[in-house]
Amino acid sequence: MNGIDAVVLATGNDFRAVEAGVHAYASRNGKYSSLTHAKIENGIFTFWMEIPLALGTVGGLTGLHPLVKFAMELLHKPSAKELMQIVAVAGLAQNFAALRSLTTTGIQEGHMKMH
């Protein structure tokens, strides 16, 4: 969720609402389940994420806060749908990096470099 929250915050959206929605979605079947999925089919590795997102690109802070305006320009002024795709990809990329760390050196080694 760190990557997701970062993009949501940078674009002036409500990260608390996104967090609540995603966590509710992850537990929709009575137990907490993964938001990301992976498979290998016909030699092709597929990694995807399913999350509920309701994000905006107009109104609110998008036209008022200079850093939000900059973030939206940096992202080439995406539509709401495109922004949701960007946010999901950020989350997926972060999850993929975490899986790599877990299957190689471990999460702790990477975090210890920060201290």
Task: Set out the residue ranges of the language-model regions.
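Glycine-rich anion/phosphate-binding loop at the beta-strand->alpha-helix junction
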Residues: 1-67
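Catalytic-core signal marking the mid-to-C-terminal active-site face
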Residues: 37-115
